[in-house]
Design a protein with these regions (language model features):
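Domain-level recognition of nuclease-like catalytic cores that cleave nucleotide substrates
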Residues: 153-196
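Short acidic loop-to-beta-strand element that houses the catalytic metal-binding Asp/Glu
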Residues: 106-114
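Short, amphipathic alpha-helical interaction segments positioned at domain boundaries
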Residues: 4-43
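Acidic-basic catalytic patches of nuclease active cores, encompassing PD-(D/E)XK
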Residues: 39-102
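Active-site beta-strand-loop-beta-strand hairpin of nuclease catalytic cores
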Residues: 113-123
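Basic, amphipathic alpha-helical patches used to engage nucleic acids or provide basic targeting signals
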Residues: 123, 133-153, 173-174
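Short beta-strand-loop-alpha-helix junction that forms the active-site gateway
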Residues: 126-135, 164
Length: 196
């Protein structure tokens, strides 16, 4: 019986606080907690995507440095829209290119492979993500690649795009019309064979 009296007194004196907590404070607290967790999730997802992209760039750069010219037919079969006389060659330098300091606009190209002899150099864009590659991205890449070719004095070059998730149909038509090579072949991401 005493518990019942205590409960009635407690509810009467604290009912406003209980109602306020149940209808406003608790949902606000959970909303803030959810937003904080969502923000952390987005940050981690962004880092994961960045690492995924960097991994793909690294593996493709390794393939171009050590494997592509040795297994020319295999690597050509993984590409579309290459010039008829294209062959992978030994590249003097293969790296991810960043525009010089104070260059306006600042830009970054995923892969620049400069040919040693008279072969084709490669300027590449790498996308290792779920979304397909779009025409808008192709135009932006083409613009950056043109600026890179001018800055680095790259003469004979092939632009190429690697997109693990493929391309929109209108993007393939655009790439073909512009003479840009492309690939969605996962074999590019196979680790290069050691000791060759």
């Amino acid at each position: 019986m005493q518990d019942n009296i205590f409960d009635k007194v407690f509810r009467r004196s604290c009912s406003d606080d209980i109602d306020k907590f149940a209808t406003r404070d608790a949902p606000d607290e959970y909303r803030r907690l959810f937003e904080e967790i969502q923000e952390r999730y987005e940050r981690l997802r962004g880092e994961y995507s960045r690492y995924k992209g960097a991994f793909a760039e690294f593996v493709i750069i390794s393939q171009l440095k050590s494997e592509a010219f040795r297994m020319n037919d295999r690597f050509i079969s993984m590409m579309e829209n290459l010039p008829a006389d294209f062959e992978f060659t030994e590249y003097g330098n293969v790296w991810s290119y960043h525009s010089p300091p104070l260059h306006d606009p600042e830009f970054q190209i995923d892969i620049l492979a400069k040919a040693k002899g008279g072969g084709y150099s490669l300027i590449g864009e790498v996308k290792n993500r779920k979304a397909k590659f779009s025409v808008r991205e192709a135009k932006a890449f083409q613009e950056k690649a043109g600026e890179l070719a001018r800055l680095e004095n790259v003469g004979k070059a092939v632009l190429f795009v690697f997109s693990i998730s493929g391309f929109h149909k209108n993007t393939l038509a655009y790439l073909k019309k512009q003479g840009i090579a492309w690939s969605a072949d996962r074999r590019w991401l196979d680790a290069p064979k050691a000791g060759r």
